[in-house]
From Swiss-Prot:
Source lineage: Eukaryota, Viridiplantae, Streptophyta, Embryophyta, Tracheophyta
Major subcellular location class: mitochondrion
Coiled-coil zones: none
Organism: Arabidopsis thaliana
The protein, known as: NADH dehydrogenase [ubiquinone] 1 beta subcomplex subunit 9
Quaternary structure (record): Complex I is composed of at least 49 different subunits.
Amino acid sequence: MSGVSTAAYFARRAAQKERVRILYRRALKDTLNWAVHRHIFYRDASDLREKFNVNQDVEDVDRIDKLIAHGEAEYNKWRHPDPYIVPWAPGGSKFCRNPTPPAGIEIVYNYGLEDNP
C-alpha cells in the first residue's frame, strides 16, 4: 500500500466514522420523539444501539458505505413527521421572541446610585 492510498483509506474511514456518529445521534434523538415515556425510550435506545453494534467490526470500506446508505435511508423512512422542538430553539414557538416593553417603562442603569435631591 503506497502512502497516498494509505492516506486516502484513512481519510475515507474517518469520513465513514463521522457519518455513522451523526446517523446514530440523529436516530437517537428521533427515537426520543417517538417515545411517550422514558422507559419506552430507554428500551428503544438500547435496541438502536444493538443495531449499530452488530456491524461495528466490518472492515470492508465498500460494505460500510452500503450499510451507512441503508441506515440513512431507513432513518429517513422512519423519521418522526412532527418532531419535538424545545420552545427556545430555532424553529420553536418562542425562538427570537423579545416583546417590546410597555410604554412608560424606563430602564434605570445606575440602580442604587441615584442622586437624591
